[in-house]
């Protein structure tokens, strides 16, 4: 039976196993598919890390990745997502989809007969979460009991971090302006999981409260792709949520700073923080390769 990863929630039973597999694949690059596998990558949004890491991941696994831009496909001229899913399922072994609309990813997965990966949409960014917590484990040598502070917009990254933290037993405190909180249904799912794993979940509008005694500080862009018309207003609202040297004084001395990138220095984070000794953002970016290898190998082997 085929398995999709549309949400971090889809990994609630084996996220830790996937992280362990990703670390193993990073250490041993001789592990590959015995038969060539093909990935179709549909990108409605631009990409640096996701596209290139998926291509490298497939190459290292004895596979191949095909880049598909909707403007070059019949889907851009009115062909349905359902028909696109059915056709691609005859051609390839697995599909990744970076979409503006979460419902479109769900629709593709519903009609595809091969696994579908959410490569980022307006609600979640599940593959990033595997890379993130893989990186945390490499740096901290544990996950359960750590505290992660997320500062900024309650966007797709905040949603996915909520779920990932709850599954792995990582305490999470999210600081965002009122009206920009994470998705309510995802927060409900995270709280439900936390009843089993025991992690603490906090939503606040005070970044200092969130960062207090944290092991990980995470931020993301304030203006997501497709929200460019909101830039001026959001930058004004979010400036008090900038991760800067003053704010990080409230964290543990050995905290690590994370960002899924691309970053805007001087907005959500200062250059001093993202380019400083606590930053692990480029290790985090590199681990996109190995985390995606782990996910794909898990689904196809």
Swiss-Prot record:
Stretches that traverse the bilayer: none
Chief localization: cytoplasm
Localization terms from the record: Cytoplasm
Binding-site residues, carbamoyl phosphate: 47-50, 74, 98, 125-128, 260-261, 288
UniProt pathway annotation: Amino-acid biosynthesis; L-arginine biosynthesis; L-arginine from L-ornithine and carbamoyl phosphate: step 1/3
GO cellular component terms, A-Z: cytoplasm
Keywords attached to this entry: Amino-acid biosynthesis, Arginine biosynthesis, Cytoplasm, Transferase
Catalytic activity line of the entry: carbamoyl phosphate + L-ornithine = L-citrulline + phosphate + H(+)
EC assignment: 2.1.3.3
InterPro entries, alphabetized: Asp/Orn_carbamoyltranf_P-bd, Asp/Orn_carbamoylTrfase, Asp/Orn_carbamoylTrfase_sf, Asp_carbamoyltransf_Asp/Orn-bd, Orn/put_carbamltrans, OTCase_ArgI
Annotated binding of L-ornithine, by residue: 156, 220, 224-225
BP GO annotations: arginine biosynthetic process via ornithine; citrulline biosynthetic process; L-arginine biosynthetic process
A GO MF term: amino acid binding
Similarity field: Belongs to the aspartate/ornithine carbamoyltransferase superfamily. OTCase family.
Annotated function: Reversibly catalyzes the transfer of the carbamoyl group from carbamoyl phosphate (CP) to the N(epsilon) atom of ornithine (ORN) to produce L-citrulline.
NCBIfam families xref list: orni_carb_tr, PRK00779.1
PANTHER family, sorted: ORNITHINE CARBAMOYLTRANSFERASE, MITOCHONDRIAL, ORNITHINE TRANSCARBAMYLASE, MITOCHONDRIAL
UniProt cross-references to HAMAP family, sorted A to Z: OTCase
Protein name (database record): Ornithine carbamoyltransferase
